[in-house]
């Protein structure tokens, strides 16, 4: 089962990814984790990436694809894998295709921007414990304070509306075109193309997961 999840920030990809890797016993492949591991091991690709990062540059798609190919040779990928945060751009998607790294399913978790903003901007954190509340979906007993300690809750900078709108802007300009790319490829009838599915990201975690599993196992 070789999977990729697409969707905007706050669409619930991380939650569903955790459930999927547990169900199918496949690893979650993160380019960030791969970069850190390759640098720690001192592999040729890792050393190349380290030099670029230390000089403030962006790691090239060639290096990223090389890291992906290396990672997929590990025995834990024999049953498949789930891509996390990769590819991010059309150039990376084309590079993945050219490298003959095949996918079985690409799943878009679709959530309206305004709902994403409501989901994320409503989060409130009790910093010392890490407890998370939501002003609408999971409010504290008393507004603005932690249920257990009575200490104040904060809104992280990343959860502020202005920041979320910027992240959504980046998603729509860079990553959202991947939806069209994989959709058109699937519709082309190519044997190499993964199946493409769009599911609603609105509902409970279990409902969304059940919908994904139904798609994958039908």
Curated annotation (Swiss-Prot):
Residues 30-59 are annotated as: NMP. It is an enzyme of class 2 (transferase). AMP binds at residues 31, 36, 57-59, 85-88, 92, 156, 167. GO terms for cellular component: cytoplasm. PANTHER family: NUCLEOTIDE KINASE. This is Adenylate kinase. Belongs to the adenylate kinase family. Residues 122-159 are annotated as: LID. It comes from the Bacteria. The keyword Kinase applies. Its main location: cytoplasm. Its EC number is 2.7.4.3. It comes from Legionella pneumophila (strain Lens). The gene is adk.
């Amino acid at each position: 089962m070789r999977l990729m999840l697409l969707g905007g920030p706050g669409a619930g990809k991380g939650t569903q990814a955790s459930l999927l890797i547990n169900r199918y016993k496949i690893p979650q492949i993160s380019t960030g984790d791969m970069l850190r591991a390759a640098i720690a091991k001192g592999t040729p690709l890792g050393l190349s990436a380290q030099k670029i990062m230390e000089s403030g540059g962006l790691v090239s798609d060639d290096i990223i694809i090389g890291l992906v190919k290396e990672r997929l040779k590990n025995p834990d990928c024999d049953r498949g894998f789930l891509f996390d945060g990769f590819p991010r751009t059309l150039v990376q998607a084309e590079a993945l295709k050219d490298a003959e790294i095949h996918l079985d399913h690409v799943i878009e978790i679709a959530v309206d921007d305004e709902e994403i903003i409501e989901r994320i901007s409503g989060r409130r954190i009790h910093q010392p414990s890490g407890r998370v509340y939501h002003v609408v979906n999971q409010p504290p007993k008393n507004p603005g304070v932690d249920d257990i300690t009575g200490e104040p809750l904060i809104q992280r900078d990343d959860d502020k509306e202005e920041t979320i709108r910027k992240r959504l802007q980046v998603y729509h300009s860079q990553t959202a075109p991947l939806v069209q790319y994989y959709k058109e490829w699937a519709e082309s009838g190519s044997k190499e193309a993964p199946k493409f599915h769009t599911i609603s990201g609105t509902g409970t975690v279990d409902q969304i997961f059940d919908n994904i599993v139904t798609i994958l196992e039908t």
